[in-house]
Design a protein with these regions (language model features):
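A cross-family signal for N-terminal binding/gating loops and helix N-caps
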Residues: 1-103, 107-111
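Alpha-helical structural motif
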Residues: 3-6, 10, 19, 118-121, ...
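Residue-identity detector for glycine
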Residues: 4, 13, 41, 51, ...
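Basic, nucleic-acid-binding surfaces and adjacent catalytic neighborhoods in DNA/RNA-processing proteins
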Residues: 22-35, 48, 142-239
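Short clusters of hydrophobic/aromatic residues that line enzyme substrate/ligand-binding pockets
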Residues: 39, 125, 189
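Phosphate/anion-contacting hairpin/loop surfaces
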Residues: 64-165, 170-177
Length: 239
């Protein structure tokens, strides 16, 4: 399942391909959104990620929230590219140069843009780890809160209500970097350990976003190994 960094990068790609572009055509082939096919002049005015979801905002006051789960996939191609696919097409946006398509996903929700934050899924999400306003202090406060302080880190780091966007590989890398076991609880940690864990959560997640899923510190890797190993092939410390 794509985690926060992969979802954010895909949202970036979609934004570049279709945001505020004139759409030659569009298709909405999931029953939750098929009424949009009857509307003329639809344009994508914004694309963003929130945790593991992508929210596409349209110029008609509607937003489409999609979650790829294990099987959904976005693709972006030139209009001249012939695509062979055995997946079910769910959404297609076509501009004069690019075609963006969502395949196979089933978790697709149509929202009123002004009421996005009232949807139960969005309302219950924790702070987005990749949001610039989510700081190390924000994460530390979550760890020390009554709601989360007595939960094992192995489960907590996958809980989207704690911090949105974390998943299996990020959890493994964060725990390794922090020197902590999955059975450890935030309440077992002292102030320095809370800070180090919070820092690892933020830094490793941002690094994965910036380095296309690679969680290794590139500068540290170069100092340690020079040209002995290919940085691009060794993507994680433990996962």
């Amino acid at each position: 399942m794509p985690e926060g960094p992969e979802t954010r990068r895909m949202a970036d790609g979609l934004s570049k391909a279709i945001k505020k572009k004139d759409l030659i055509s569009y298709q909405f082939l999931h029953p939750n959104i098929d009424t949009l096919n009857d509307l003329k002049g639809i344009k994508v005015i914004d694309v963003s990620s929130l945790g593991k979801t992508i929210i596409t905002r349209l110029n008609i006051g509607k937003s489409i929230m999609t979650h790829n789960q294990l099987y959904g996939k976005w693709s972006i191609n030139l209009t001249t590219t012939v695509v062979k696919h055995n997946r079910k097409l769910r959404i297609e946006y076509k501009t004069s140069k690019k075609i963006a398509r969502l395949w196979s996903a089933t978790d697709i929700v149509l929202l009123e843009t002004e009421k996005e934050n009232t949807h139960h899924y969005i309302k219950n999400l924790g702070p987005d780890v990749l949001n610039n306003f989510v700081t190390i202090e924000t994460i530390a406060n979550q760890l020390e809160s009554k709601k989360f302080r007595n939960r094992n880190l192995g489960g907590l780091l996958l809980n989207q209500n704690f911090i949105a966007g974390l998943g299996n590989y990020l959890r493994s890398e964060i725990l390794f970097s922090s020197g902590l076991l999955p059975t450890t609880r935030p309440s077992d940690l002292d102030e320095n350990q809370i800070y180090n864990l919070s820092n690892s959560i933020k830094v490793i997640s941002m690094r994965a976003y910036q380095q296309k899923g690679n969680t290794i510190d590139k500068d540290d890797f170069s100092k340690r190994f020079g040209n002995i190993f290919n940085f691009r092939l060794i993507r994680h410390m433990v996962f």
